[in-house]
């Protein structure tokens, strides 16, 4: 899988999402639950806004000194016996991982949940050279078995119910029991444990890398990442270049913000800090590789969108977004969905495929208020719109013509008066009572789902003139 998860046009993807009543119900329920849990966890911590400000300061400081901390990380990982590779592009990252697998003559690779490995199409790259890649996160495993893309940053299978999951397991894996979550989890655990023992390589993502120790931090709910890091003889960790913290002190702050913002817990079930195995340690990989991925991030770092790199992938913005609630994650056409996806995806994937995403927002600002590191997401969405219109010249032709006509009419009293007199007659074929019930062209996007007020037959100036004279209108 790559960052792009669908070849459908944006409007078609949105239409599919709106018509999927189960998905909308599941998203609504999950958003409400996660939002409530997040508020409770924040209240328990106390001084939540001060913690947000501290998180923002840590992320901003790290980005301002990213070159220094990356070099420090590289030196410390190397001192501990690990190998570090800086990949400028996603192709370079995938090629390096392929080369490691070839060198090890690996046939089976087990991995934990990682957005950046999806971004670089790692699974596909390994499958090209004959490796079997197994997802160990339960949600990702369900999607892998069903060949279905993720719809949420932290809950990838959110759009499926347990009956659908049972049917997938029955059809693809020969599962014969009920749709009880415990029974299905037990079944998957048995499937995965057998594969863990046979895997030559384990691949993980990285929530945060600690510069001054050369350590990596992984946060999971299932403990699968611990097995991925400890059982296979070779471990490959893949991280976006921005996922840095200077020391363990900053890590402590950001992990607390991440867990509370993502799932409303003080800590998730497993927070693991690890790296290359040391002499005194009894388990862990014999060989460790860290792949640091740029893939456009250095350009973002030097742009007006820099603050998006503060993201800690908690999905708090997704969990409060009213647009995501109604259209779901697949509508974004990217592994990165919700407000953060609408900002980040066009920067990584370009406007040609993702120019609609910055407009998939009501600009209500709920995402900005929810972000634990205070990324001004709704402002960044507006900046995207400005770039699309002014720098790229990508405003739709119909919109350009409409704005040009409005500009001409609004700047001429005579044209404005003539237009206001003609409007009622021009719209009468589409009017029922005092509402526009159907539209043509761009108006259909509005009138197909809501009523539009019909133009008044009486101009305001005429009404005001009569009212001022004491008329009874």
UniProtKB/Swiss-Prot annotation:
It comes from the Bacteria. Residues 302-332, 351-380 form the 4Fe-4S ferredoxin-type domain. [4Fe-4S] cluster 2 binds at residues 321, 364, 367. Keywords: 4Fe-4S, Electron transport, Iron, Iron-sulfur, Metal-binding, Repeat, Transport. Pfam families: Fer4_8, LUD_dom, LutB_C. The keyword Iron applies. InterPro entries: 4Fe4S_Fe-S-bd, 4Fe4S_Fe_S_CS, FTHF_cligase-like_sf, Helical_ferredxn, LUD_dom, LutB, LutB/LldF, LutB_C. One of its GO terms (biological process) is lactate catabolic process. SUPFAM superfamilies: alpha-helical ferredoxin, NagB/RpiA/CoA transferase-like. GO terms for molecular function: 4 iron, 4 sulfur cluster binding; L-lactate dehydrogenase activity; metal ion binding. [4Fe-4S] cluster 1 binds at residues 311, 314, 317, 371. Is involved in L-lactate degradation and allows cells to grow with lactate as the sole carbon source. Has probably a role as an electron transporter during oxidation of L-lactate. Belongs to the LutB/YkgF family. This is Lactate utilization protein B. The gene is lutB.
